[in-house]
Amino acid sequence: MQSPCNRRLGGAAVAVAIVALSALQAGAAPPPVPEVTAKDRAAIIGSIVGDLNDTYVFADVAEKMANLLRKELAAGTYDGVTTLPAFCELLTVELQGVSHDRHLIVRWEPPPPDVGGKPPSAAEERARELAELRRGNYCFERIEHLPGNVGYLKLDCLADAGVGGATAVAAMNFLAGSDALIFDLRDNGGGEPSMIQLINSYLFEAPTHLNSFYIRKGDQTEQFWTQAHVEGSRLTDVPVFVLTSGYTFSGGEEFAYNLKSTKRGTIVGETTGGGAHPVRRFPVAGYPVTVNVPFGLAINPITGTNWEGTGVAPDVPTTATAALDTAYVKALETVEAKTKDEVVKREVAWMREGATARLQPFAVAESSLRGYAGTYGLRTVTSEGGALNYQRRGRGKFALVPMARDLFVIPELDYFRVAFERDAGGQVVRLVGLYANGRSEPSDRTAR
């Protein structure tokens, strides 16, 4: 039996979908929509029933699904469905209605337009998948060094470590000097367990049992542990934050669940989608149709269960939109609390205050904002459409976000803030540019 390491935990059609999208974007005509006859419907259902009974993780549920499909076929329920895409969608609804398993999907997969309407061979399909993964940077969407020495990695799917491992190693080595880490999985719909295993291995010192897969066929259980060796430095004492959304699914969920159950990471965002079954894709002979059949289930060594149907609940609930700013503030709080260097502590506190202001702007009435508008030497402040803008002569214009009374941040300029001073009568008379290094530049008001 092939190891689950070579089977996808979600995202089973990612590369295929990318191939089709690329072809359409290149100007190719969409493939014709094939019709289905009664004979076609019976053949497709017969193939799917065989795969379910042979492979689906829960044999009793497989039997219920098979019985439903046979019953509805015999009753003529599907007679009005005459196109293949619609039939596949209906079968997916039927199967998920019984199993409540979002991994169980029947797909119409037309051949790419550039192969003359013929189904690609396995070698051609694999070559296409690898090419698209490479063009997509093996799902490593973005990597950054954020102010305050916080590392950030946006990972939108999970490529097989056998092809994307070098990129993962490069990413983790780029992040190696970080004082805190943020993994952004808000757009991660799943992928390969081997990539989870590789990246998680950088976060633990001792060998750690991350997850197991029970596989119904053969009644086997396979364990996944962190790797004994990684290329570069481990980040075992660096605080970790994982961003999630309702879209985060399958392998993306395992990544989060592993770190949550081991208390190695803090989950920030929304409860995830709830899919914990690895899948195998089966072709339906004679038709451009595949069925994703969950063949096993995840078993966490600490909780003894998984996230199927429930999702991974965040430790810090917030919207997906606010998750990054929320995690960034918490990361800076952690770094600030740990550091002994007073200069670094002051710099990190500055970043934390600015990030908090962006996340939770200080409320200022529009009438009060207009009171700041004016000219301050080389600096101009304008009130436009209920917002305040700052501009230094000869430079760009930036929005001012209230941080406190008479204190504003500029989101694009982490190192700079704008403060205003008042006279005894409460009138704004001076603008002071504040810098993260402690320097300040006062400018008296010269015009309103």
Which positions does each model-derived feature cover?
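Terminal peptide-recognition signature
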Residues: I48, L95, L153, F183, ...
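Gly/Ser/Thr-rich loop/hinge elements
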Residues: G190-P239, L243, Y247, H277-A285, ...
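Peripheral terminal and inter-domain segments
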Residues: P34, D341-R448
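Bacterial N-terminal signal peptides that target proteins for export
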Residues: Q2-V14
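A short, well-ordered alpha-helical element
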Residues: A161-D179
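Mature N-terminal segment immediately following signal peptide/propeptide cleavage
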Residues: K39-K64
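Bacterial N-terminal signal peptides
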Residues: A12-A23
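Extended, small/polar residue-biased N-terminal targeting/export presequences
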Residues: A59-G148, R346
